[in-house]
Amino acid sequence: MNHSPQSARPVSIMRRFLDSEAAGGITLMAAAALALIVANSPFAQTYFDALHLYIGPLSLAHWINDALMAIFFLLVGLEIKREMLDGQLASWPNRMLPGIAAAGGVILPAIIFAVLNHDNPAKLRGWAVPSATDIAFALGVLSLLGSRAPSSLKVFLATLAILDDLAAVVIIAIFYTAEISMPYLGAAFITAAVLFVMNRMGVVKLLPYLISAVILWFFVFNSGVHATVAGVVAALMIPLKPAPGRPDDMTSPLHKLEHALAKPVAFIVVPIFGFANAGISFKGLEASVLGDTLTLGILLGLFLGKQFGVFGAAWLAIKTGLAEKPMGASWVQLYGVAILCGIGFTMSIFIGLLSFPSDLMQTETKIGVLSGSALSAICGYLLLRAARPDQSAANPLWKADESPEAKNFGRFLCVFHFASYIASTYCTERLQAASSLLRRSSLEFALPGLLKRLIPRRFRAVETEIPVVRLHGAIMTGGTSLRPTLSLASTAGILEKAFADKHAPAVAISINSPGGAPVQSRLIYRRIRDLAVEHQKKVFVFVEDVAASGGYMIALAGDEIIADPSSIVGSIGVVSASFGFPELLKKIGVERRVYTAGSNKVTLDPFQPEKAEDIERLKALQLEIHATFIDMVKERRAGKLGDNPDLFSGLFWTGTTAASLGLIDGLGDMRSFLRKTYGDKVKLKLIQPQRGLLGRKLPGIGMDSGSVEPAQIAAHLGDGLLCVAEEKAIWARYGL
């Protein structure tokens, strides 16, 4: 049967793709991307339920991580043995540069992670997560550069990654072993001994080795040592020498098994692992997870620790004469490859799953690994694409002013930051959040200030940092993102966040409120005082335009109250306001029917004429609330209040007069006051409302719920207009 060239072409294209160096990395990236999409799609629940589906004694996720990945580690072990005995690592001179660089790439990321998490033993278990390099992913990115990257760099990266994997295997075997079962461990040693004896006796048939490897996996799995170690041990026992009478080394059991496993592992095993473990649901995740020390430790360990550890160790080895620089590679290209070593994906996620049983910590681990790996892949690729080969053996390490590749990389950073600022100005709220997050991240990677923070606090001079909370708006429930208001529901989160800063000696609260609901005012006041006592912090309140009525009640939570000379302060009283429509229904021909059980259930009905007894009852309630307000002022301002008879009459004053009456402690502004109190180097840190991982505002300052949908806006438009009118009326009492 004849085939046309057209019908044969798709097959040849697929074959070329599968044979390319980048194929494994591209497939893994696609699997990870697909997992993220599915985990945040309508099929998310099905995806997670499937992973927790039990097949025999284990869930599907455990079969993938404990059994399927043993095949991956079997291939890793085969590659390590072949390279050590008959490859790039067969001689000590060839081992020196990648070996020293790999050591630096394991040690420095672990140190960065440990420094950030030294005070949390549970998180510290993940110290090895950022120490691994994903060989398929890293080589896949490097191969995308084609001839731009010298072959010596590819050999260097492959060799370094193999040594990295060897270190990871040793770390897993030593540090991530559960409670040991000695009978099963003994059986595992006996099985390994059988494999060793078969090797020494010259057995070259693969089947006995594979059967023994499965038995070894079973015993190791039940011993408490992680089952994937069985794959490496079995690989080390498989003969590298060919069968007698077969001089071709490629006929050896090791070569045949390695060749048979290469494509299934690259295109089936590893992508399945990536798909099963890269799925992160962003629903309900807060942006604060990006600032968690666990996430940061992994992200910075991979992105900064790897590149500085690998490149620094390689530079020292080359400069001291212990090793030679890869032929034809420039220093910038070597640095680019060091950045690519921060692609940790497969092995990093695997170690993370061993380190943390908690779902939240595993999610933070995956976010850190994905973020650090993505940054390393993008920056490493861009730098290598801009770099040029070594022109001279005597080329100095860095000539920033003359190096074309450095200039190109600088241009890239400038364009990136300019684009992100444009996005922050013109894009939607969600894109603004993502853009500013990326911009801040790239700046922090570039600035030495972040590196300074990696040093333990007791070993560095730390500037005093004061959290600042801004409370702005009328005090009432029911606010939205379109009409922000103050209530306990809207302020509790941001207040908790401000007082949680254990290094801050105080919290500064900037208030600009004309008052509103007395209950919400007192609840906010009470929450501030409770947090101040709980965290043993001073509270400084700074008045902007106005702190009147309920706004002043909140201000009483401060140990000191500072206002501008022109601020409006006071209005210690109670006011109730509503509308009356006693004739409206009659004029429009509507009859209102009200049925009650209880003679006072229609008190202050706006559709009925005012009643004297209703007004009297309301006045009594107001007097009780007023008395509570007065007691609060006298308690918090004890020994400071003046004798003005109008102090509690509801009048309000400028900041200058309020200071003379003892309602505030002084005049000034926040920055000047705090600099005078804590020194010129004090820093103010504005506490922002929390956002979800994708930039959506979470319930917080100025609103009781999340974002408002168009249907909600339409449904509550009338109510919203009345509330806006009421709020405007409150501000208008003070000429604002």
From Swiss-Prot:
<keyword id="KW-0406">Ion transport</keyword>
<protein>
    <recommendedName>
        <fullName>Na(+)/H(+) antiporter NhaA</fullName>
    </recommendedName>
</protein>
<comment type="similarity">
    <text>In the N-terminal section; belongs to the NhaA Na(+)/H(+) (TC 2.A.33) antiporter family.</text>
</comment>
<dbReference type="InterPro" id="IPR047272">
    <property type="entry name" value="S49_SppA_C"/>
</dbReference>
<feature type="transmembrane region" description="Helical">
    <location>
        <begin position="367"/>
        <end position="387"/>
    </location>
</feature>
<feature type="transmembrane region" description="Helical">
    <location>
        <begin position="265"/>
        <end position="285"/>
    </location>
</feature>
<dbReference type="InterPro" id="IPR004670">
    <property type="entry name" value="NhaA"/>
</dbReference>
<dbReference type="GO" id="GO:0006508">
    <property type="term" value="P:proteolysis"/>
</dbReference>
<dbReference type="InterPro" id="IPR023171">
    <property type="entry name" value="Na/H_antiporter_dom_sf"/>
</dbReference>
<feature type="transmembrane region" description="Helical">
    <location>
        <begin position="126"/>
        <end position="146"/>
    </location>
</feature>
<feature type="transmembrane region" description="Helical">
    <location>
        <begin position="58"/>
        <end position="78"/>
    </location>
</feature>
<keyword id="KW-0997">Cell inner membrane</keyword>
<comment type="function">
    <text>Na(+)/H(+) antiporter that extrudes sodium in exchange for external protons.</text>
</comment>
<keyword id="KW-0472">Membrane</keyword>
<keyword id="KW-0813">Transport</keyword>
<dbReference type="Pfam" id="PF06965">
    <property type="entry name" value="Na_H_antiport_1"/>
</dbReference>
<dbReference type="GO" id="GO:0005886">
    <property type="term" value="C:plasma membrane"/>
</dbReference>
<feature type="transmembrane region" description="Helical">
    <location>
        <begin position="224"/>
        <end position="244"/>
    </location>
</feature>
<comment type="similarity">
    <text>In the C-terminal section; belongs to the peptidase S49 family.</text>
</comment>
<feature type="transmembrane region" description="Helical">
    <location>
        <begin position="298"/>
        <end position="318"/>
    </location>
</feature>
<feature type="transmembrane region" description="Helical">
    <location>
        <begin position="96"/>
        <end position="116"/>
    </location>
</feature>
<keyword id="KW-0915">Sodium</keyword>
<dbReference type="GO" id="GO:0006885">
    <property type="term" value="P:regulation of pH"/>
</dbReference>
<dbReference type="InterPro" id="IPR002142">
    <property type="entry name" value="Peptidase_S49"/>
</dbReference>
<feature type="transmembrane region" description="Helical">
    <location>
        <begin position="201"/>
        <end position="221"/>
    </location>
</feature>
<dbReference type="GO" id="GO:0008233">
    <property type="term" value="F:peptidase activity"/>
</dbReference>
<feature type="region of interest" description="Peptidase S49">
    <location>
        <begin position="388"/>
        <end position="736"/>
    </location>
</feature>
<feature type="transmembrane region" description="Helical">
    <location>
        <begin position="178"/>
        <end position="198"/>
    </location>
</feature>
<feature type="transmembrane region" description="Helical">
    <location>
        <begin position="334"/>
        <end position="354"/>
    </location>
</feature>
<keyword id="KW-0739">Sodium transport</keyword>
<dbReference type="GO" id="GO:0015385">
    <property type="term" value="F:sodium:proton antiporter activity"/>
</dbReference>
<feature type="transmembrane region" description="Helical">
    <location>
        <begin position="23"/>
        <end position="43"/>
    </location>
</feature>
<feature type="region of interest" description="Na(+)/H(+) antiporter NhaA">
    <location>
        <begin position="1"/>
        <end position="387"/>
    </location>
</feature>
<dbReference type="InterPro" id="IPR029045">
    <property type="entry name" value="ClpP/crotonase-like_dom_sf"/>
</dbReference>
<dbReference type="Pfam" id="PF01343">
    <property type="entry name" value="Peptidase_S49"/>
</dbReference>
<feature type="transmembrane region" description="Helical">
    <location>
        <begin position="155"/>
        <end position="175"/>
    </location>
</feature>
<keyword id="KW-0050">Antiport</keyword>
<keyword id="KW-0812">Transmembrane</keyword>
<keyword id="KW-1133">Transmembrane helix</keyword>
<keyword id="KW-1003">Cell membrane</keyword>
